[in-house]
A protein has these predicted regions:
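Short juxta-domain linker segments that transition from a proline/glycine-rich
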Residues: 1-297
């Protein structure tokens, strides 16, 4: 059976080959007939396009688009904790962001209509009002734990998917087991978009960490900001105003004040049975609610 030939845009192909700075002579050795694909005298199969993408180290999907997208500019628009400079971003993180941007570009073309909640709020809004709205959109009660039981991550993922948000989990670059994602570098990121918003979660994190990141990035969508999330729990928890606002909402959704005050004990082991978050988040919540003092914290 003959493989299906693809009508690849030659300008797109040439753009990414030149941008990769891979010498043409080397590419010709790695990919047979690459010159014929560039001048249009031959059409490549999907596997052959994949070979080119691998040779120039970009996602295959970029070569299948009808126009180029400048992923580097989009990547540099991200904010990180403490406004960290992104020049030192690992190739694993950079390639993962590119992969998600390609997926988003494709999905955007398949979807009609806009999502009205993306960018609906700002940090000047009352955080409790934002919490109420997010709960309404997710269709979850304040005491969601009764419904989620011990599967809170799956519970929220399904609720978020239902809103038209695409959620991806991975602990490596695509299927490459040699290119693992570093939890010390990032826990997740969000690509805000009115049609095809994407949340990516670093699967190397704990389940409770993944859940906190998932809700954290969801809140960023309601504010309409792209972000790479990286909070190491031993840090001093200092954020810019946007991060402080987002984390306040995230904590209230996952550990509602009314539910926490119902607990008769502040023993962390007991509280962990009721709330699917880390002990650090619980202690921080107790401090913010003035249930414990700064000294105890």
């Amino acid at each position: 059976m003959m493989s299906t030939k693809l009508n690849v845009n030659q300008k797109v192909l040439l753009y990414y080959i030149e941008k990769s700075k891979v010498p043409r002579e080397l590419l010709q050795l790695k990919v047979k007939n690459v010159d014929a694909y560039l001048d249009g005298s031959k059409e490549p199969t999907f596997n052959q396009v994949t070979e080119i993408a691998k040779a120039i180290n970009i996602p295959t999907g970029l070569l299948l688009l009808n126009k180029t997208i400048d992923t580097d500019e989009n990547i540099l628009s991200f904010r990180t904790l403490n406004s960290r400079n992104l020049e030192g971003m690992s190739s694993e993180l950079r390639d993962t962001i590119r992969e998600m941007q390609v997926k988003q570009d494709f999905l955007r073309g398949e979807i009609e209509g806009n999502l009205n909640y993306v960018g609906k709020f700002s940090i000047s809004d009352n955080y409790l009002e934002v919490v109420r709205e997010i709960r309404t959109y997710l269709q979850i009660p304040i005491d969601y734990q009764k419904e989620a039981k011990n599967k809170a991550l799956d519970y929220f993922r399904k609720k978020i998917n239902y809103l038209g948000i695409f959620v991806f989990f991975n602990g490596k670059v695509k299927d490459n087991t040699h290119r693992k994602l570093d939890i010390k570098e990032f826990r997740g990121f969000v690509l805000s978009d009115k049609k095809a918003p994407i949340i990516f979660i670093n699967q190397k994190d704990s389940k409770s960490g993944q859940l906190f990141t998932l809700i954290h990035e969801l809140v960023h969508l309601f504010i309409g900001t792209d972000e790479i999330y990286n909070v190491i729990e031993t840090d001093n928890y200092q954020f810019d105003p946007t991060e402080a606002f987002v984390n306040k909402i995230t904590a209230e959704i996952l550990v509602p004040e009314t539910e926490l005050r119902k607990c008769t004990s502040i023993d962390l082991e007991e509280l962990s049975k009721n709330f699917p978050v880390s002990k650090f988040v619980l202690v921080r919540r107790l401090l913010d609610m003035k249930i414990i003092s700064k000294t105890v914290y």
